[in-house]
Amino acid sequence: MSVSAHAPGRRRRALLLSSSLAFGAAACYADGPLHPLDGDGGAPLAPGAPLSWSVARPGPYACGHRTLDATYAQPGGLPARTIPVHLWYPSKVAAGDHPVYRNVFPDAHAWEGVPLAPSPWPSGFPVLVHSHGYKGFAGNSARLMCYLASHGWLAAAPEHVGNTIGDTPDPLPLAVYFQRPLDVRAALDLLAAPPQGDPLEGKADLTRVAMSGHSFGVYTTWAVAGATFDAGAIKAKCDGGMVAACTDAQRAVFATDLSEKRARAVVPMAEARNDFFGAAGYDAVRVPALLMSGSLNPVGADALFAAVTGVDLTWVDVKGGCHQLFGLGNTALGDPACQVLSDEAGFSLVNPWVLAYARYHVLADRGAEVSGLVEGSSSISPLVQAEHKAP
């Protein structure tokens, strides 16, 4: 396997294409609804426990979607903040209406408001919480959210109000940088204590949480994971006008703990450069991280992988991958260069990797398929290169 895209001198894990793993079939399951309906409107479940379901294809559940609001007290002298939290969840019903995110982006893979399935996990559903990108929206990575939901996970994505497709000022207020990780905390708090009588009440297992983020959501992900902030760099951004509405009270927020201890593994996708953390801030992270990038979207993942020394860090790079490989789809922005990897082919590489990593680190899955992928003895595809370094 070629390693020319990466800087020399690092430990490369040889990833072997294994015919015993059914990853080659993943793209066959990527189109259309996850389930044909059976006679009573339900979807039959595959036999066996959830950890026996192959990560290479969607799981046996349909993907439900709904939205709840979360309100929390903000630091830095700001008023209470209310944000919508989008939820994708396992269902046995694949019927009815599809969600349309921001009234613009339809999602044919999810079903609005269908009943929540009983949890296949005795302790409740494990959770993936996700942070969208700059000028994004909660449903930007809905294909990943539905993939996890099909395998029996709850997926939650807060809409980062003030930094979405319709309401982002330039320059960004400093508060956005602490609101993002606090929005994630609020989303998890909502799952821990939903409205009384809500079907989600008591159903989320908040001891088993993974976190992912796309683009600017990578900043959120590292902050949630415990990266520490460089006060000098933040002051320089304020003084230079790169961020707005800086106050002493708001700068002081970054000296507090903005991490989320419930997150047991993190997946930053399609971004690696953020000087809010300084040279050493990443090394404060104490949970495993899966850094994902596309070869056609150089964001400095190689430099970050080389620089970080204190983190259990895996770097996965997808040949032909563009910025929206981890969001709306690899070809979504219309760049002709991105056509080399179709949306469906891209999803069939990214989604199984994220699921496998979450199962390995959050659910302690050491089955042959998952451990082979995460530990490096097998691969989804020759298009995927992976590298690992221990702290």
Ranges and model annotations:
Residues 37-128, 150:
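Domain-level recognition of soluble alpha/beta enzyme cores
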Residues 320-322, 328-391:
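Alpha/beta-hydrolase-fold serine-hydrolase catalytic core, especially in secreted/extracellular enzymes
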